[in-house]
């Protein structure tokens, strides 16, 4: 191969390569790359593929544990559920594609994460999503929001995997740069977990699935750049998915894996053929030769650069045992899919690409996939000014209140009015407008409808092939067991204090699982941040990773893998970059041994006794109340007390397992008052609450009602077990619990009073329901 002429600085920059990185490429190759090779380095050395800014920080995460079977580095993490069952799970982002083409961007995000799951040999059983948008009053946000939800529902519904839960936040910080994070779970169906490292010199390399076109060109590099007003021109970088073809691909792959003829498998996601060949070769310590002329195409006159960087969807790369390739090809043809032998595993650790009989690219595999650039940036010596100023805020800056309410700018707002305002806030309000577009009951294993509990719960039914696993016959599998999953992040907490905020994310995820009776097992994380090249951006990323690592260690929930999405920024009208709130989303899974011992968040029976587990210490700093009612984003988020978190969560789980706790709900955004309202609405039952309020607290009733703090769970217990339950609480929580009141009838209100019977809130279920259920639809004028 002869050296080509140097590229112009503009051509190099267009591939997302920095000048010093290009010099390193030339040094490694001993020559200048050609156009195809330049493109290969551009995508593989992008942040999206190689994590060059975040990799040093990710090393802090705990990644091992007694149930961890596969940790970071593979397509998905895998945990042991016992009884011969193994769960694969992973979260991924599709933020930038969704910003320029919301429907396809979100749809292909679903398709991509599902491929990560079934590539391991697992059948997808559930999807969750974590979404962030700008203000819902903004017409642009309405378009993005509607498009993303439609894209998620289209792909998930068509492919036949239920979307069982998630979260949606709205904040101007995400205007123009929405976050679309999708988590998938799958139950292992193959005798062995399928890995991605190529092996066996001379083994054939198979291309299977859909055809290759020009869609998704440069998607990985696009996902590693900041968005601008011109990003709409990058629509060709957004892939187009076919969920019906993916449904066939799932079945064909699982059937193929069960033959034992597959050595390794890799999804063609970001960077397409380039990524799958280089990663499989590098992980196996071998090389791969691939002939582009063998690749099935959907467009004519494609050149190597286009083949190698295409991100056409629903494609996979297999390494097969020599002599068994036709067996696999026949399976894929029977499912109406493409399948061809396109290459070979070679001893030389090189990715060598042929096109029209000549070498089109030749690069050491580890230069693309392992030995990639690494940037260890200098951390700010002290927190940035915005954080220090925010931390100076205290509740003394707010007007004091009375039992009648609080006066804001000359107008008295009753606590009841404030509660209704918060229930009408899209971030807090019901997401039924979203959920009703998803098929959340396909596969017939969904235990709670979305919104009915603090975490999604899916029944674990024996799947085909599990009898061959160590547990013996399928009948040995406990069909009463289930898996719970949640996705969580309070981005305002993380913005105001990345370290404490990230710890709170892990704590809330575990708390949500505990509220349904699940034992938290492991984490997959999605780090959505701004530019790490800016000191504040890197400080936020570094501090959040430190907090996540500590939280996962404290709660014994190792990280099995995840995704990093940086450069999430938009430009204001003056052309200044504005980063999103730092948003480290935690996806956490938990095990439920007995599905008859679970509970949702709604009250269950008239006369049940209501308790608040945990400390009564709360803060208005970083709260939804402060942001919505006072239009102020300031203060410190609640500090996490991991010892109390562990005790409160364990008490909740054990209370559920013993049959004492009939409902459980985390006190999160909006504080105690919102949690009470949500439990009333979920159970369609009122409640009478009596709060012990000290003379000092009388002036800060907003903190009592709407203050936020960790380690707080609202539970209801059948009255006949009150004495036993309170004795149990005293033994395990000491003074860290309160009896609040009793559950009322369907026609009673939510009444919150002081212990001397002064009414703070009295509101009907009907009025709360109108605000809560219709908040999003009203803003969309639907």
Swiss-Prot record:
Domain of life, per lineage: Bacteria
One GO CC annotation: cytoplasm
Compartment(s) where it occurs, according to its Swiss-Prot or TrEMBL record: Cytoplasm
Name listed for the protein in its UniProt record: Phosphoribosylformylglycinamidine synthase subunit PurL
Binding site for ATP: 51, 90, 525, 562
HAMAP family linked: PurL_2
Gene name in the database record: purL
Quaternary state and interactors: Monomer. Part of the FGAM synthase complex composed of 1 PurL, 1 PurQ and 2 PurS subunits.
Residues binding substrate: 93-96, 115, 239, 311-313, 565
Database matches in InterPro entries: PRibForGlyAmidine_synth_PurL, PurL_linker, PurM-like_C_dom, PurM-like_C_sf, PurM-like_N, PurM-like_N_sf
Residues that hold Mg(2+) 1 according to the record: 92, 563
Catalytic-site annotation from UniProt: 48, 94
PANTHER family: PHOSPHORIBOSYLFORMYLGLYCINAMIDINE SYNTHASE SUBUNIT PURL (PTHR43555:SF1)
EC number(s) recorded for this UniProt protein: 6.3.5.3
Reactions mediated catalytically: N(2)-formyl-N(1)-(5-phospho-beta-D-ribosyl)glycinamide + L-glutamine + ATP + H2O = 2-formamido-N(1)-(5-O-phospho-beta-D-ribosyl)acetamidine + L-glutamate + ADP + phosphate + H(+)
Source taxonomy: Bacteria, Bacillati, Cyanobacteriota, Cyanophyceae, Nostocales
A GO molecular-function descriptor: ATP binding
């Amino acid at each position: 191969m002869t050296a080509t002429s140097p590229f112009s600085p503009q051509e190099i920059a267009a591939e997302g390569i920095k000048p010093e990185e290009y010099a390193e490429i030339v040094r490694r190759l001993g020559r200048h790359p050609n156009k195809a090779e330049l493109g290969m380095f551009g995508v593989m050395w992008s942040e999206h593929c190689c994590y060059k800014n975040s990799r040093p920080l990710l090393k802090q995460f705990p990644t091992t544990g007694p149930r961890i079977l596969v940790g970071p580095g593979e397509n998905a993490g895998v945990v042991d559920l016992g009884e011969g069952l193994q769960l694969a799970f992973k979260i991924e982002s599709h933020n930038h594609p969704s910003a320029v083409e919301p429907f396809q961007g979100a749809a292909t995000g679903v398709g991509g994460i599902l491929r990560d799951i079934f590539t391991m040999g697992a059948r997808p059983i559930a999807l969750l999503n974590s979404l962030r948008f700008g203000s819902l009053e903004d017409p642009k946000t309405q378009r993005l929001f509607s498009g993303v939800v439609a894209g998620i529902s289209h792909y998930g519904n068509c492919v036949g995997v239920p979307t069982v839960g998630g979260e949606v936040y709205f904040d101007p910080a995400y205007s123009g740069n929405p976050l679309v994070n999708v988590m998938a779970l799958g139950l292992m169906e193959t005798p062995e977990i399928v890995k991605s490292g190529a092996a066996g010199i001379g083994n054939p390399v198979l291309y299977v699935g859909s055809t290759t076109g020009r869609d998704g060109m440069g998607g990985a590099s696009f996902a590693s750049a900041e968005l601008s007003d011109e990003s709409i021109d990058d629509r060709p970088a957004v892939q187009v998915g076919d969920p019906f073809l993916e449904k066939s691909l799932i079945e064909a792959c699982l059937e193929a894996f069960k033959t034992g003829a597959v050595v390794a498998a890799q999804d063609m996601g970001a960077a397409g053929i380039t990524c799958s060949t280089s990663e499989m070769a590098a992980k196996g310590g071998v090389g791969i030769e691939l002939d582009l002329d063998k690749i099935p195409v959907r467009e004519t006159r494609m050149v190597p650069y286009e083949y190698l960087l295409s991100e056409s969807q629903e494609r996979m790369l297999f390494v097969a045992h020599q002599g068994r390739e036709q067996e696999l090809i026949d399976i894929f043809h029977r499912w109406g899919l493409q399948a061809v032998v396109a290459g070979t595993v070679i001893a030389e650790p090189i990715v060598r690409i042929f096109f029209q009989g000549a070498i089109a690219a030749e690069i050491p595999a580890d230069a693309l996939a392992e030995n990639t650039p690494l940037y260890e940036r200098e951390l700010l010596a002290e927190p940035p000014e915005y954080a220090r100023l925010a931390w100076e805020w205290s509740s003394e800056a707010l007007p004091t209140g009375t039992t009648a309410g609080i006066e804001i700018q000359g107008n008295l707002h009753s606590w009841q009015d404030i509660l209704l305002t918060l229930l009408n806030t899209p971030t807090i309000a019901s997401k039924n407008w979203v959920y009703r577009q998803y098929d959340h009951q396909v596969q017939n294993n969904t235990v709670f409808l979305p919104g009915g509990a603090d975490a999604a719960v899916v029944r674990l039914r024996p799947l085909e092939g599990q009898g061959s696993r160590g547990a013996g016959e399928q009948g040995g599998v406990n069909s009463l067991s289930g898996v719970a999953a949640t996705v969580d992040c309070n981005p305002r907490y993380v913005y105001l204090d990345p370290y404490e905020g990230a710890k709170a994310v892990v704590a809330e995820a575990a708390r949500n699982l505990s509220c349904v009776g699940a034992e938290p097992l492991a984490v997959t994380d999605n780090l959505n941040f701004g530019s790490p090249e800016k000191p504040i951006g890197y400080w936020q990323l570094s501090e959040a990773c430190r907090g996540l690592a500590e939280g996962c260690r404290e709660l014994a929930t190792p990280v099995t893998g995840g995704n990093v999405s940086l450069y999430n920024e938009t430009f204001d009208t003056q052309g200044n970059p504005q980063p999103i709130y730092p948003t480290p989303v935690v996806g956490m899974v938990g095990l439920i041994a007995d599905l008859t011992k679970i509970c949702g968040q709604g009250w269950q029976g008239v006369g049940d006794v209501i308790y608040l587990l945990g400390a009564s210490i709360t803060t208005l700093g970083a709260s939804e109340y402060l942001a919505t009612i006072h239009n102020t984003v300031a203060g410190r988020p609640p500090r996490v007390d991991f010892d109390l978190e562990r005790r409160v969560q364990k008490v909740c789980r054990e209370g559920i397992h013993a049959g004492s706790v009939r409902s459980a709900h985390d006190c999160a955004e909006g504080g105690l008052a919102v949690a009470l309202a949500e439990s009333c609405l979920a159970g369609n039952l009122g409640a009478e609450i009596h709060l012990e309020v000290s003379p000092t607290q009388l002036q800060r009733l907003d903190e009592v009602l709407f203050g936020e703090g960790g380690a707080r769970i609202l539970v209801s217990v059948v009255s006949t077990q009150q004495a036993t339950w309170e004795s149990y609480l005293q033994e395990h929580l000491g003074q860290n619990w309160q009896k609040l009141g009793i559950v009322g009838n369907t026609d009673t209100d939510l009444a919150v009073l002081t212990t001397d019977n002064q009414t703070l809130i009295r509101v009907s279920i009907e009025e709360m329901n109108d605000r809560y259920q219709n908040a999003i639809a009203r803003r969309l004028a639907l």
